[in-house]
Amino acid sequence: MSEVKASLKGARLSAQKARLVVDQIRGKSVSEALNILTFSPKKAAVIVKKVLESAIANAEHNEGADVDDLRVSTAYVDEAMTLKRIMPRAKGRADRILKRGCHITVKVAD
């Protein structure tokens, strides 16, 4: 079986914060990765877990893979478009607020 991919585009989460979670599961078995994500207190863990579960479902449904043999072969986070917003400040000034997004990609293989 080749690699099976699942990705989430435009997640409303900074790439820096998502990478902290993704780095923990790269190269691990699928069951171990799900365990790590389940007990992680970070917001990114919930999002990455959904992407990983999607990759597992894709492998099982499309390739007929055995879930017990799957490993997280590749996992990476790319920056998405940043939304620029304005926060009014004193004396007519304004500060810029950057609402960052990211693209999360997880590939599983046996």
From Swiss-Prot:
Pfam families: Ribosomal_L22 (PF00237). GO terms for cellular component: cytosolic large ribosomal subunit. One of its GO terms (biological process) is translation. GO terms for molecular function: rRNA binding; structural constituent of ribosome. InterPro entries: Ribosomal_uL22 (IPR001063), Ribosomal_uL22_bac/chlpt-type (IPR005727), Ribosomal_uL22_bac/org-type (IPR047867), Ribosomal_uL22_CS (IPR018260), Ribosomal_uL22_sf (IPR036394). PROSITE patterns: RIBOSOMAL_L22. Keywords: Ribonucleoprotein, Ribosomal protein, RNA-binding, rRNA-binding. Part of the 50S ribosomal subunit. This protein binds specifically to 23S rRNA; its binding is stimulated by other ribosomal proteins, e.g. L4, L17, and L20. It is important during the early stages of 50S assembly. It makes multiple contacts with different domains of the 23S rRNA in the assembled 50S subunit and ribosome. The globular domain of the protein is located near the polypeptide exit tunnel on the outside of the subunit, while an extended beta-hairpin is found that lines the wall of the exit tunnel in the center of the 70S ribosome. Belongs to the universal ribosomal protein uL22 family. This is Large ribosomal subunit protein uL22.
